[in-house]
Amino acid sequence: MAYNWWVIRVLCNKSLEEVIFWRLDSFGCRGTASQIQGKNCLVLAYLPEEQTQLLDLSALSLNFRQDALCMNFPVPIMDWYLIEEEDWASSWKQYWQPQEIGDHFLIHPAWLDLPEQSDKIILRLDPGAAFGTGTHPTTQLCLESLEMRLGLEPHPEAIIADIGCGSGILSIGAALLGVHQIYAVDIDPLAIRSTINNGKLNQIKAEKLIVEQGDIKKLIKLCPKPVDGIVCNILAEVIIDIIPHLTAIAKPKTWGIISGILLEQAKLIGDTLEQNGWVVATLWKKEEWCCFNIRYS
């Protein structure tokens, strides 16, 4: 039996992209993509027809409006329409092309042929319904920070933790940069599946990338000893709650890469980090977003 799918399109300011993704994920959407259009961003998402009603879609549009007004951005434009099942899984993929990030990474959609020659570290990705294609400034900042932190030399004993792994892009990036062991968690089961599948796409061994569904408390139980590094690219409101727990997996000189944070939220995050024993080494910025590079003292 064929099913129909809602296509939800949201045209918004680029700085709202992560909030839009979060709303769509919470709404139950499967498969998301985004395309930068000047100062704006076109976000697409898909939802089974039977899973929602028109009134629910209208309420979602109102949530987008309220988010934008609270953050002093223009109100997003949202519309929706139905397509048949065989079209939904691939229709969003036309909006996503290979993208270079930093000095060494090439994020490459899994359904496209690999380049015949490349001097880049090719990270193959099929995000499915999980957040993290490499197009968002916070993901780019995190990958660039990983490059800076790890370089291109192997790290045969290094262990890192990934909080809110999404598509697995940061965990896999770390593995491709030579990290020995990665522990990753996400509360979304679709993200867990996506991270595992993308690990296989990039020939990362399952024992190297340990992925479990859960929150920071699950991660603390998962890590057998303090880690060398922590990556976390999620909403600032969640980061605030997580920071006091980070010491449970940290040791002196553990480094961290923390993003998902608007510039206007940076002071609160920075103050909270310092109150919990972390030193802010650098603060990187891209558009309206920032990334903390930190160290545990």
From Swiss-Prot:
Protein family membership: Belongs to the methyltransferase superfamily. PrmA family.
Alphabetical GO biological process terms: methylation
Enzyme superclass (EC): transferase
GO cellular component, one term: cytoplasm
EC number(s) recorded for this UniProt protein: 2.1.1.-
Gene designation: prmA
Keywords, sorted A to Z: Cytoplasm, Methyltransferase, S-adenosyl-L-methionine, Transferase
Primary residence: cytoplasm
Reactions that this protein is recorded to catalyse: L-lysyl-[protein] + 3 S-adenosyl-L-methionine = N(6),N(6),N(6)-trimethyl-L-lysyl-[protein] + 3 S-adenosyl-L-homocysteine + 3 H(+)
Protein name as it appears in the record: Ribosomal protein L11 methyltransferase
Binding site for S-adenosyl-L-methionine: T139, G164, D186, N233
Function: Methylates ribosomal protein L11.
Annotated GO MF terms: protein-lysine N-methyltransferase activity
Keyword set includes Lipid metabolism: no
Localization of this protein: Cytoplasm
Pfam family, one: PrmA
Highest taxon of the lineage: Bacteria
